[in-house]
């Protein structure tokens, strides 16, 4: 599975909420942060069909908005747990 990419803006409250969630759940080493202030990440986000942040690319699908991103990260976290 591809490493999920979190497209965000530093000054945006909803992006900050998602970044805090990632840190609080100790997923920093499992999620790639992509600041769309820079052309590379902005171009990659556009290439996935998006422009709004926060957004999460899971390798297959783009999830947009803090609630959708956190829900997808929770699902990925559940998949990574062993029984």
For the regions a protein language model found, what residue spans apply to each?
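Non-catalytic, surface beta->alpha helical segment in thiol-disulfide oxidoreductase systems
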Residues: 57-83
């Amino acid at each position: 599975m591809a490493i999920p990419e979190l497209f965000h803006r530093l000054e945006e409250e909803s992006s900050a909420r998602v970044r805090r969630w990632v840190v609080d759940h100790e997923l920093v080493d499992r999620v790639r942060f992509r600041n769309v202030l820079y052309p590379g990440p902005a171009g990659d986000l556009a290439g996935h069909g998006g422009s709004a942040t926060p957004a999460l690319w899971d390798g297959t699908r783009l999830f947009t908005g803090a609630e959708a991103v956190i829900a997808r990260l929770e699902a990925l976290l559940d998949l990574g747990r062993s029984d």
